[in-house]
């Protein structure tokens, strides 16, 4: 990949008394005057909203972005309805913008909205509301020392200034998502610094809580699907890439091209079925809980394919519960929708760990062809590009006692799969 992905950061704040002379600013600037920004590994689990997810659903844990889905973390907006996103464009006194905000909007929209529309089968709409004027920051871009592993004090100063200058012209109470977009041509802007910033304690502006913002420092044109990846964090989805402790090595060993939360450059960026289940886009008969002992015959519709108008979506995800906080997920991946550039079609198997932190490997794709690779000139991780099983192939998942056999493919493109557990 052309650049290393960035995990989120969390900002902890301590409120202290502080007056402001503009009543509309309320606590936004006042709160930021005492921000202490720290990189954290987890957050306390937010309030739960009951969700009838079924017997094979893993319980949500305190792990940051836990893939447990028996309840929804109400600290995050659930994308099961229309959500509104504001785009705020920030310029700096050390650089006159060479591009119009409208051009930066076009870098990300409607592509990001269409990504989520396809992934959700039309159940979710993300509506951008760009303010098509530059808002001047009070300090030079170089003063903030913007970079990938940003110094917390500098990040705090940037966020403080950005929200302070935006507040007089933006009514934050109208929006569910906030994108702070920096002038890509300013000398101090580093495209590797794009990420979501979470506030351990929400800020209040215009009578609404601001719990997180997306800081966008992308070049023009930007990396593909970058805003879809970052927006996924806003909806409580984890990073699926592997970050080597020494900063070296391959980042894509966990999921390869599969799912935009692993790599925004992946050939198969559609969200995993497990993610769609968590977000409320799959449910009921679309998820099959496989019995713990015995064999089950399933017909899996391709996850990426939109159901015909007025027709049932069919079964999209099969789940084998393997432990209190673990499961095997089985889904069919095709070459339509968000996966139009996929390397390999077939039945994909992956492990899910509900107690594993974002960035720690909460999902691991099972390589059913460990002795081969595919699309070496395009894939972010060729060893997993051919991970799915094809028709006539059988694979027993190591250590899980589960065998998956792809028996056939129907005329409509669905996959007939036999899953045997307890082997």
Question: For the regions a protein language model found, what residue spans apply to each?
Answer:
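Short, solvent-exposed loop/turn segments at the edges of secondary structure
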Residues: 82, 254-256, 344
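Extracellular hydrolytic enzyme modules, especially secreted metalloproteases
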Residues: 172, 177, 185-339
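Short, solvent-exposed loop/turn elements at domain surfaces
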Residues: 94-100, 268-273, 338-340, 358
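Active-site-proximal beta-strand/loop segments in catalytic clefts of secreted hydrolases
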Residues: 88-93, 181-185, 237-240, 262-266, ...
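Zn2+-dependent metallopeptidase catalytic core
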Residues: 51-220, 228, 246, 405
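Secretory targeting and sorting signals
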Residues: 3-5, 14-50
